[in-house]
Amino acid sequence: MRFLFTDVNPMITHGLGRTLTELGETVEIIDAGLASQQDPDSLEHAISSFNPDYVCSQGGWGKLGDIIFPILRRKGIPHIFWASEDPLFFESLSLPMARNSQYVFTTAAECIDKYYSQGIKAHLMLFACSPSFHHRVEPDPRFNHDCIFVGNNYSQFPARLKGMEIILKPLIDKDFDLKVYGLDWWLNRQNRFFIEPHIYGGGLAYEEMRTAYSSAKIVLGLHSVDTSPTMISMRTFESLGCGAFYLTQWTPAVENLFSNHEHLVWSKSPQETVELVEYYLARPEERQRIARNGQAYVYARHTYHHRAEEFLNALQTPAVGSRHDYGCCYTVDSNFNRRWRVMKVKRVAINMKNP
């Protein structure tokens, strides 16, 4: 099959799009937002020249949908939407996109019923890692710190701000060897949370993240959602895939998907964060054991090959269905590991060849 992706987000370029190519599908990735700004006609030209079976997008387009959805309707090409901003932007971004899509995937299980209340069939598809990209590499002295955080300052989200207070602030207050990488919003004193220049490590290209993850003793994690049973930061899967020792704020999704002190470590308070960092900095062998376990676990359950299977199997089901034939549900076992099963959907083999 032929898939045209409209986003150059790493979860596509190094994730789902990359993996579909590895599985033998034909994939083209364009920056539809940039293209529409330069020349609105270029989108229709790209679609016509590639002639995709499906056009796929993630997140949200804003006004771009006003341009591209009429093109897809004229050409009879189905649209696939991965609502990667759920649940935070369900109403403002996801729902308008989903209403114009034939297949909808969400990272937040709790949103599935919300879609169904709007007559929209939705499937669960979490973030993941790509072992062909997310793996350990040669350490770099630039990132040889006790603790690092890679990400942007989204302190406008209450859960994210809470995580900063639990994970970052106590380490800053105790003067640990910590570097924070991301956009320079971190230095803006008008934000609800900011850091001093000596803590800021600057911007970091996505291709350099695995080097940073392979070099630091502890990689820190924050999440913008702390109420979802499934939605967590994509960095969780990526850092574990790179063999990092990952210490993160606790959320229900982290506990549902992973085991504490086995795959990663979570903290529920500033005091616990300091205690965990002091404990594991003094015990490199334990850090390495947990990091190996975490990498093995995501490689076994949470790669984009797993997601591509879920994705391709969902495309074998009718694009429009009743409330009773929808995709995914979840149960929690005694170890708090979430296990997914597909209801009334026949599992089919992935077609490894182009048509």
Task: Please tell me what each predicted stretch does.
Residues 1-46, 50, 59-67, 103, ...:
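Nucleotide-sugar donor-binding catalytic core of glycosyltransferases
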Residues 56:
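N-terminal Rossmann-like NAD(P) cofactor-binding module of classical short-chain dehydrogenase/reductase
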Residues 67-75, 96-97, 167-170:
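Catalytic-core regions built around general acid/base machinery
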Residues 72-85:
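Active-site proximal beta-strand in glycosyltransferases
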Residues 87-102:
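Membrane-proximal helix-turn-helix segments that form the acceptor-binding/catalytic region
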Residues 264-270, 279-284:
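Conserved acidic donor-binding segment of nucleotide-sugar-dependent glycosyltransferases
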Residues 279-355:
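C-terminal amphipathic helix plus adjacent low-complexity
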